[in-house]
Design a protein with these regions (language model features):
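Conserved catalytic core of the tyrosine transesterase superfamily
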Residues: 1-191
Length: 191
């Protein structure tokens, strides 16, 4: 059966989406950190909301992620590290209800963020950014993979970062990139 290709955002659309949360308020700072981490690492939403404080290594510039029985160590680019630092040091301590709370990302009640909670957040920023695409919680994951491929990363490395046990799951992104190239070619070739 032909796998349906996921929708991805262009680099510009990702920038637009990431620019929506206002880092100056607590919720905005948390939301920006969540979106930056998703795009920086390509982790699944379930993995994002399951992150604990000790999964983040800011000095090393990576996060430790456990998904489908495997542990992955994934690099985080500097801007996302900074957003994480701001959230972890300035905002999270004011949001948690219980000082022993281990969850990295918490909701307004100070408890672990839920999938539904995150879903509402990403949809609201999509509307603000006026991105007319069918965004799902996995859209940033798909965009992460496609943008790495477009910029020359190899499929094996992407497979490892995404935590795919089977390379065929990762090959979908190669198809996506080919499709995008074809669209660009058709649009811009002078003949």
């Amino acid at each position: 059966a032909e796998k349906k290709l996921p929708q991805i955002l262009s680099g510009k659309e990702v920038e637009l989406l990431l620019a929506q949360p206002k880092a100056s308020d607590m919720k905005g700072c948390r939301d920006k950190a969540m979106l930056e981490v998703l795009y920086a690492t390509g982790i699944r939403v379930s993995e994002l909301i399951n992150l604990n404080m000790d999964d983040v290594n800011l000095p090393g510039g990576f996060i430790r992620c456990e998904g489908s029985g495997k542990v992955r160590i994934i690099p985080v680019y500097p801007e996302a590290q900074q957003m994480l630092r701001d959230y972890m040091e300035d905002v999270r301590p004011k949001m948690i209800a219980n000082p022993a709370e281990q969850s990295l990302f918490v909701n307004v009640s100070g408890e672990r963020m839920s999938r539904q909670g995150f879903w509402k957040i990403i949809k609201s920023y999509q509307e603000k950014a006026q991105i007319d695409k069918d965004i799902t919680p996995h859209t940033l994951r798909h965009s992460f993979a496609a943008h790495l491929l477009e910029n020359g990363a190899d499929l094996r490395s992407i497979q490892e970062m995404l935590g795919h046990s089977d390379i065929s799951s990762t090959q979908v992104y190669a198809q996506l990139v080919k499709q995008n190239l074809k669209a660009v070619y058709n649009k811009y070739h002078p003949k």
